[in-house]
């Protein structure tokens, strides 16, 4: 059941992208669209100078971004909720 729902959703998305790209006048539009969809370089921690949620860290070095804290147990940055 889950697999069929996933395939239906993936097929719908693919149909939408192909239909939208075919209406475009530019021939390189599908390549540009796919490169923008799969561009994940925006979320890298090195560019922001601190480590975000889920990034590995060393406790006590204050490497995590504001509102995050390095977990002593798991050794990765978590959202700091305070006490």
From Swiss-Prot:
One of its GO terms (molecular function) is ion channel inhibitor activity. InterPro entries: Huwentoxin-1, Huwentoxin_CS1. Expressed by the venom gland. It holds the Pfam family Toxin_12. One of its GO terms (cellular component) is extracellular region. The modification Leucine amide is found at residue 81. The keyword Disulfide bond applies. It comes from Cyriopagopus hainanus (Chinese bird spider). Residues 1-21 form the signal peptide. Belongs to the neurotoxin 10 (Hwtx-1) family. 15 (Hntx-3) subfamily. Lethal neurotoxin. Selectively blocks tetrodotoxin-sensitive voltage-gated sodium channels (Nav). Does not affect tetrodotoxin-resistant voltage-gated sodium channels or calcium channels. Residues 22-48 form a propeptide. It is found in: Secreted. Its main location: secreted. The presence of a 'disulfide through disulfide knot' structurally defines this protein as a knottin. This is Mu-theraphotoxin-Hhn2j 4. Monomer. Disulfide bonds join 50-65, 57-70, 64-77. Keywords: Amidation, Disulfide bond, Ion channel impairing toxin, Knottin, Neurotoxin, Presynaptic neurotoxin, Secreted, Signal, Toxin, Voltage-gated sodium channel impairing toxin.
């Amino acid at each position: 059941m889950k697999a069929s729902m996933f395939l239906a959703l993936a097929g719908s998305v693919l149909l939408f992208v192909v239909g939208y790209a075919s209406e475009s006048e530019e021939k390189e539009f599908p390549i540009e669209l796919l490169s923008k969809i799969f561009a994940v370089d925006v979320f890298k921690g090195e560019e922001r100078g601190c480590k975000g949620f889920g990034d590995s860290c060393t406790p006590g070095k204050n490497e995590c971004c504001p509102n995050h804290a390095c977990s002593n147990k798991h050794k990765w940055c978590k959202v700091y909720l305070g006490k």
